Structures are given as structure tokens and as C-alpha cells.
Amino acid sequence: MENRQTHLDRSLGLIHATASNMATMVGIGPFITIPLIISAMGGPQAMLGWAVGAIIAISDGQVWAELSTSLPGEGGSYVYLREAYKKYFGKLAAFLFIWTFLLSGPLEIASGFVGMVQYASFIWPMLNETNIRILAFAVGVFTIILHYNRVKFVGAVTVFLWIVMLVTVGITIFVGLTHFHVRDAFTFTHGWFSFSWGFVSGLGSATLIAMYDLMGYYNICYLEEEVKRPEYVVPRAIILSVIGVTMIYAVMNISILSTMPWQEIARSTHVASDMFNQTLGRHWAIILTILVIITAYGSTYSLMMSYSRLPFAAARDGFFFKWLGEIHPRKHFPHFSLLTVGIMTCVASLFNLDFIIAASLSSRILIQFLGQIIGLTLLRKNEPARKRPFRMWLYPIPSVIAFIGFSFIFLSSGWEAIGVGVVWMIIGVMIYVKWNGNHESGIAGA
């Protein structure tokens, strides 16, 4: 009988793992968030948000590294939460993670749609705020239709689009540095470092935006079974990729700040285009705008495809609604899961960009990030004999830093975003009680 390989090859070393992680982290984010982060703190001091965000990401990265090496395999957060809380409410924790993901995932995709259309308004200035929302909604509908028609063009050139994005980031940095004005780049407002409520509130908002841009620092944990010496490589890959991406984004911020007054940046909805317009002229600004739109759409298309797989996988494993595990009979993809994520994305596209970003992160914090931090402590307490190839350095200090950091971000996200996240979670608990009762009773469709 032919021997079948039942495990993945561990071929990713530190350099490959770091590059892979950075590849998933670098994206459209800074092109749409630089005005928001500058506005949050009122000047170049917004760089502090990047520094605090990097510290939180590195600390939380150790939580992910320990969980992924002690609970290897597919599933990610919903497996970590299920196992960590299994003595208490593991199934509920896993369900709530998928439930909150049905909100946070579409919000993240919607931020790309809205940001992309805002850049289009540089080419077509007649697009007002209402038009932008309607057009972003229409782009969402168009993307669902593309998925249903199994258009593979965007998926086939994902790597190419990512390279174009890197080139776009690189060109933006290069143009900024070659037109550098120190006075503009470091024009701090009077009394900017006064420890006041305004400073703390602004730092919280800036850190939230920085964390939105750094999301993905944990993606290498999903490839743990393909990493050489994961106990060594995974935590170091997270740290190196966070530092690397933070430096890229910080230099990009400084490059743009050096060419435009920060007050003008804070008001812009297509800041990179405005920078090119001022330094190289409208012709080159339009070319950059088109590059940003193309790469933004490529990334959001891929996100909708990949994010629709998580509810599908959870449903197939029996931890979510059974109907989300249905596969299209002819085109062979999880169409109900895709429709759900797609429709939620279209609705989310009708809101303001700053609210979308705040809600996309705040809705994940309670269950996923804080839940995993507490869950790691519970696993150590309840299963001390479990094999842990990687153990958090200086435990529990990174856990404490990450917990305080995410709590700070959550409280800084604004009452509207907090309210949406909390209400969505409460609704999820009520639906779970009903679903779990039907599921255990064997009712079809549960």
C-alpha cells in the first residue's frame, strides 16, 4: 500500500517566516489612515501611536506564539478559545469568536472599499460623501457577483498586486524623502506632550489606527506546522515583522509630513495623491491614484474570499450554523458564507471610514484578543503538563502589557464603536443559547 504523507513539510526558516508575515501585513492601510492618525493627535506626534502599537503587537505576538505552538494545526483563534475555556464555556467562546468575526471581517473589507472610492474622488472631484458611500456599496455588490462568476483573475495575480503595492509604498517614501522639508515633518504643536485627557485620548485613537494597520502580525501562527523549529522562529518572526512594518509605515508618515502641512494632511481623503499632486503634478498623482485603487481592490477581493472560509470551516466542524457550511452545487465554493460576509460588507460600506476602522478593531478585542490573553493563563493553570514548545518570555509581563494595551484601545474607540461591539456580542450570546439548544436536539439547519 502506498504511504500517504500526513504532515506538512517544515520548510520555513526565520527569514522566510518573517517575509511571509510582512507580506500579509503590508497593504492599503497607511494610504487611508495617515490622515486619521495625524488628526487623532494633532500633528507629527502621532508617531507615538506607531510606537505604542508596536509594543502591544510584539507583546500580544508572544500570546499567539505560545498558543499556536501548544495547540498546533488549523483553526486558529476559535480552537485556542475552545480549548482554553473548555472547562467553563469553550463552545460558547468559539461560537462568539466566529460571531464577532462576522462583524469585524466585513468591517475590515469595507474600510478598503471606502478608502478606495475616496481615492477615486481625487480623479472625479464631483464624488461627495453620499456618492462615496453609494459607490462603495456598489463595489461590494460587484465583488460578490465576481465571486459567484468564479472570476479568478484577481486571485491569480495576488502576488503581483502585492508587489505593486510595495512599489507604490516605496515610490511614496522616495518622493517624500526627495522633497523633504524638516520644518514640516517635525512641526509639533505647542504643549503637545502635556499629560492631559486630550493627549491620552488622542494617543488611544492613534494607537487604535496603528494597530489596524499592523493587523496580521499573528498570521505566521497559522503556518506553524510549516515552520522549522517553531518555538524559535515564530516569536522572532512576529517581532521582526512588527518592527519592520512599523518602520516602513513610520517612514511613510514622515515622508508625507515633510511635503505637506499636517493640518492639510488631516483633512485629506486621498493623502498620497495630494502629495504627488503638490510635488510632481496632477499627471503623476493620477497614476499613483490608479495604482492605489487597483491594489486596494485586489486585496479586498482576496479578503472577501478568504474571510468567507472561516464561518464555513467552523460550520463544517459543528461550531457554527450548519447552513453556512453549504457548498455551491455547481461552482463548488461556500456560497452562503460568502453571501453573508459580502452582504455585511456592503452594509458596513455605508458608514464613515473612521467609524468602520474603530468598530472593526473594537469588535474583536473583547472575545479574540483579551479572550486569548486570559485563555493562555487558564491553559497554564489547568493544563500545566501540556507540551509548550515555546513559552512566553518574561511571563506574564507581555500578557499584562497586551491586556492593558488592548483595553486602552477598546476604551479609546468611541462609544459608538464600543456600543456596536458590546451589543453584537450580547446578541451573539442570546443566539448561541437558542442555536445550541437546537443543535443538541438535532434540529435541521442549526
Predicted region positions:
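Hydrophobic transmembrane alpha-helices that form the core helical bundles
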Residues: 36, 49, 58-140, 145-148, ...
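C-terminal membrane-solvent junction of multi-pass transporters and transport-like membrane proteins
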Residues: 323-333, 369-418, 438-446
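Select transmembrane alpha-helical segments in multipass membrane proteins
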Residues: 11-21, 47, 55, 88-103, ...
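Membrane-interface loop-to-helix entry segments
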Residues: 117, 131-183, 197, 215, ...
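Membrane-interface "cap" regions at the ends of multi-pass membrane proteins
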Residues: 1-44, 58, 62-65, 190-191, ...
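Helix-loop-helix junctions that connect adjacent transmembrane segments
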Residues: 3-9, 47, 127-131, 160-289
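Hydrophobic alpha-helical segments of multi-pass membrane transport proteins
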Residues: 168-172, 311, 361-388, 424-442
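TM-loop-TM module centered on a large, flexible mid-protein loop between adjacent transmembrane helices
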Residues: 79-86, 122-126, 207, 239-304, ...
